[in-house]
Amino acid sequence: MANRNPGCGAFCTRRQFLLAATGTAVAVTAPYFATARQRDASEDSDRILADAESRIRQHRMAPVTLKLVTPDGQPLGPGRRVEIRQVRHRFLFGCNIFMLGRCRTPEQNAAYESRFAGIFNYATLPFYWWNYERQKGSPDHERTEEIVRWCRAHDVTTKGHPLAWNYRDPPWLTGTPQEVARAQFERITRYVQRLRGDIDIWDVVNEATHYDRAECKRDAPRLTEAIAAMGVGPYIRTAFKTARQAGRDATLVINDYRTDAAFAEKVISELADEHARPMYDVIGIQSHMHGGPWGAARTWEVCERFAKFAKPLHFTETTLVSGPKSESGWTTTAKGEEQQARLASEFYTVLFSHPAVEAITWWDFSDQGAWQMAPAGFLRDDMSAKPIYERLCDMIKGRWWTRVEAESGPEGRLRIDGFQGEYEAAVKENGRRLGGRFSLAKATAEATDVQLTELSADR
């Protein structure tokens, strides 16, 4: 069947949808109305951005009164200068980590690692079935465990992507549609159980809205036929039920590139149990913008559309490129890098200001090995930092980061307002340097005890 139109009806391809979603394919037959729409969107974007910082303060910060307790159980004396330092965001700022240890040189690997750890607290690990298990029964768990160890050492939360996706069949996968579906669900059980405690956030089903697009039928005929035989609703419900049984405390994500009503109506609304309770924990929204930026107005509109489901939103795959595609290739440019930094800072500002959003994952960290060979990274091909890296560092670890000095009052109390996350407090008392940790969230008790212990000389 022919595709309907670039405005993305039910039969639009993934590529057409992404192009249409960026707003780059305006109707050339109606320039006046296109211009009017663009003008309205621009005005909306200006308003959304102008109000963003106040929303960020409202939704991302929290007040708390700390009661500092010394190692001998007594309140810290009044008038002590206390350093309060944030060490981790509650919000998940992340990226896929596919190139960890796989860059061309040891020096590039070191740069990749240090810069990743310098900005992100969240990493997406690859679980593409056709690549992860090239031979039946021989999954690449060794690679996963290597990445998990690195993430644990750098206090980076991990996510697996994806457990089920009919993008390409594993070469060895055979059988009836029922047997193929059974193999898929058994994979979910094995991986979630094996990696429990190492990876507890999962993209369970990826891109189910348009599972039967042409490239899926061509490259994943067996998996696609299995979904068709079951029906989309029963398939995704079985996948999520299987994942929940394997990991009771896991965070389960339904992920898609469709940001229109089709995702909401065809997939999310179908993903409920017999008691009409959602079977998912998070709605995952892809935001690849290879063809151009969404703009603040569209970004906010997407957030509002999916916030109505009353579940956290994760922007799971975000891309803005730093150079135009040409016949000679796709490379980064100085002008493109500045534009990428500006557009990314606006995109992150809008998302961080929306109360439903809890995570943003960039796709990919460096231009080396990037999807579509696009200049999409925070780092160039040689692992040097682009302006986007510095700009986002200034935001994530600067403007949206809390570090203050305060004076203790009676009973060792002091009050701060800070961005939600993990904190360290440090103070000198009777010649000793004392420190303690605490968490700050909207739900944090109004008065929170911080138990201080003596710090070593190097801290």
Regions found by a protein language model. Name each.
Residues 108-118, 415-422:
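Short Pro-Gly-centered beta-turn/loop motif in secreted/extracellular proteins
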Residues 1-12, 25-27:
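N-terminal secretory signal peptides
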Residues 203, 208-229, 235, 242, ...:
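Aromatic-rich peripheral "rim/lid" segments of glycoside hydrolase catalytic domains that contact
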Residues 37-100, 134-135, 159, 231-234, ...:
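Beta-strand-rich domain onsets/edges
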Residues 421-431:
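A short, solvent-exposed beta-strand micro-motif common in secreted/extracellular proteins
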Residues 122-135, 145-250:
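Substrate-binding cleft and catalytic face of glycoside hydrolase catalytic domains
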Residues 13-21:
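N-terminal export leaders
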